[in-house]
């Protein structure tokens, strides 16, 4: 609570490559917003994700626009360009620094997949990150939230720095969506309708000259 009893604004931060954004991302963000009483969830598409340099990543502007399309119908969802406009490799520490500067009085909650937490102590400036935001680890299909690698990471973190929750188990991944698009298989109901249409219009995830069937 802020001085005078006024409740602090609670801001969720969902960073990701979003290549493409899919319904699993949206369900996870909605579930976290409900459970933690968030006022807003800001989606932050990465510029150049440092951990995915081994594969080609769709252009940042395309990923940004797909995220805008996907989140437009939910009044609690917004999209930020901080990682894209910064340039260079994207690190979570920079995302949180920028959003803290833009929202100095808000409580920040960083939303990530539970599987990413196994290596969280190797992230750049992880101590600083936990001083800026609380972390919410959400389950992904086939992943055990109480795995020993997660427990080991949590043992090194400050109290109340990290929460683990389960979300409806939608077996959707961006990788599968890309593969289906490459093979001209439908991606309806895996991603929002507007994203299906954007992928087809921009001929994403296909070799040059090959059409895409939504």
Curated annotation (Swiss-Prot):
It catalyses: nicotinate beta-D-ribonucleotide + ATP + H(+) = deamido-NAD(+) + diphosphate. It holds the Pfam family CTP_transf_like. The keyword Nucleotide-binding applies. CDD domains: NMNAT (cd02165). Keywords: ATP-binding, NAD, Nucleotide-binding, Nucleotidyltransferase, Pyridine nucleotide biosynthesis, Transferase. InterPro entries: Cyt_trans-like (IPR004821), NadD/NMNAT (IPR005248), Rossmann-like_a/b/a_fold (IPR014729). GO terms for molecular function: ATP binding; nicotinate-nucleotide adenylyltransferase activity. GO terms for biological process: NAD biosynthetic process. Its EC number is 2.7.7.18. It comes from the Bacteria. Pathway: Cofactor biosynthesis; NAD(+) biosynthesis; deamido-NAD(+) from nicotinate D-ribonucleotide: step 1/1. Signal peptide: none annotated. Catalyzes the reversible adenylation of nicotinate mononucleotide (NaMN) to nicotinic acid adenine dinucleotide (NaAD). Belongs to the NadD family. This is Probable nicotinate-nucleotide adenylyltransferase. It comes from Mycolicibacterium vanbaalenii (strain DSM 7251 / JCM 13017 / BCRC 16820 / KCTC 9966 / NRRL B-24157 / PYR-1).
